[in-house]
Amino acid sequence: MHLSAHIDPLQIILCTEIDEACIQFIKSQIEGIARACGPRMQANFEGVLIPYVDVLGKFLYRACCLRYATMGEEAARIVLAKQDRSKGLVLATTGERMTSLIFSLVIDLVGVHVNKLLKQASYSSSFKLPFGLRNLLPEAVISKEKHLVYILNSFKPILLKLVSIIRFLCLTMKGHCATVSQLLLGLKYISLDEINPEEKKKVLTLLLLLGSRLIASILQHSNSYFDQHTISSITDERDLEDKNKLPFIPEGNRKCSLCMEFIHCPAATECGHIFCWSCINGWTSKKSECPLCRAFSSPSKIILLR
């Protein structure tokens, strides 16, 4: 089979969009299985799994497509190949796709743990920067480390989206691949269709598509950011790790069943269960029910505890 090195970057975008839709479908099925396990088991199960659902969904989808093309590759008419010194362009082997999958899995897991550390740091009153980093930063910056972590955590979705777009643009235009692991392994996408070499780089269209992603992310985050700060302006920053705050709450109920951390800004549903404000607000925005007893609960009925 003769393979041509030409490819339209828009084919890679189409491939990633379709693959992402498939991954989101698998993610929704995982959440459905968790709901079918019963309310209490569901809350405990999702409390541990929620940060890893995206990683698990991506791993399951990619693992099922190791020996075959993904849905995105089929639709975009592209294949994953590698440059061989003697044979030229050859199709990527199952082993190479497996290695790429493992690399991507490790990178995603590191990202999840960094995300958890940022969240814990923004909530913890005793958070300190690592010793090595404290030595590198000016004293004025160190004195405001808690505020820096809070700002970084608040605008993290926009920063991640911006980094993701820049990374994807560089990989697509220069490496003809979609992930860092593919670039490290020398894998790249090639088109099964004839591409005019002079028109294969539609930079303007590519920038418009990726720019629209960033704008959508900024608008979405701005709405949630202002919503959170409207609420935070009328609440104090209570953390139930301190037993002196809201002492009437039993010690066994001072951890959120959704994030499995000490409850931050405690809020109660109509049925009386207590969670972090951000956790239960996000939950009821998607499912109008209590995570523990499945009683009806809407975001407008959540009660902030003072």
From Swiss-Prot:
Subcellular location: Peroxisome membrane
Segments on the Cytoplasmic face: 85-147, 220-306
Keywords, ordered alphabetically: Membrane, Metal-binding, Peroxisome, Peroxisome biogenesis, Protein transport, Transferase, Transmembrane, Transmembrane helix, Transport, Ubl conjugation pathway, Zinc, Zinc-finger
MF term (GO), any: zinc ion binding
Pfam families reported in the protein's UniProt record: zf-RING_2 (PF13639)
Gene Ontology cellular component annotations, sorted alphabetically: endoplasmic reticulum; peroxisomal membrane
Highest taxon above the source species: Eukaryota
Gene3D superfamilies: Zinc/RING finger domain, C3HC4 (zinc finger)
SUPFAM superfamilies linked to this entry: RING/U-box
Zn finger (RING-type) start-end: 256-294
Entry EC no(s): 2.3.2.27
Membership in a protein family: Belongs to the pex2/pex10/pex12 family.
General function of this protein: E3 ubiquitin-protein ligase component of a retrotranslocation channel required for peroxisome organization by mediating export of the PEX5 receptor from peroxisomes to the cytosol, thereby promoting PEX5 recycling. The retrotranslocation channel is composed of PEX2, PEX10 and PEX12; each subunit contributing transmembrane segments that coassemble into an open channel that specifically allows the passage of PEX5 through the peroxisomal membrane. PEX10 also regulates PEX5 recycling by acting as a E3 ubiquitin-protein ligase.
Name this polypeptide is given: Peroxisome biogenesis factor 10
Species lineage: Eukaryota, Fungi, Dikarya, Ascomycota, Taphrinomycotina
